[in-house]
Amino acid sequence: MRILYLLFSLLFLALQVSPGLSSPRRDMLFCKGGSCHFGGCPSHLIKVGSCFGFRSCCKWPWNA
């Protein structure tokens, strides 16, 4: 029965980190004016930091 609690807590943690369920406002707070992208940045943007989870904070080169 204790392992069931552990599985539910891990599932809850995984759902919080997933990109579709996180708050866009919280991501923008971490990014500070850039845009958050899952994984790496597109080729025309540069990485300036990280957003919540596995996202990269990307900005235009002339705004960085």
From Swiss-Prot:
One of its GO terms (biological process) is defense response. Expressed in circulating heterophil granulocytes and bone marrow (at protein level). Strong expression in the bone marrow, lung and testis. Moderate expression in the bursa and intestine. Low expression in the cloaca, gall bladder, brain, pancreas, trachea, air sacs and spleen. Expressed in the vagina, ovarian stroma and the theca layer of the ovarian follicle, but not in the granulosa layer of the ovarian follicle. One of its GO terms (cellular component) is extracellular space. Its main location: secreted. It is found in: Secreted; Cytoplasmic granule. Changing residue 17 to A: In strain: Xinghua. Disulfide bonds join 31-57, 36-51, 41-58. One of its GO terms (molecular function) is chemoattractant activity. Residues 23-28 form a propeptide. Residues 1-22 form the signal peptide. Induction: Not induced in the ovarian follicle by intravenous injection of LPS. Expression in cultured vaginal cells is increased by LPS and S.enteritidis. Keywords: Antibiotic, Antimicrobial, Defensin, Disulfide bond, Secreted, Signal. The keyword Secreted applies. InterPro entries: Defensin_beta-like. Coiled coil: none annotated. Potent antibacterial activity against the Gram-negative bacterium E.coli ML-35, and against the Gram-positive bacterium L.monocytogenes EGD. Lacks antifungal activity against C.albicans. Belongs to the beta-defensin family. This is Gallinacin-2. It comes from Gallus gallus. The gene is GAL2.
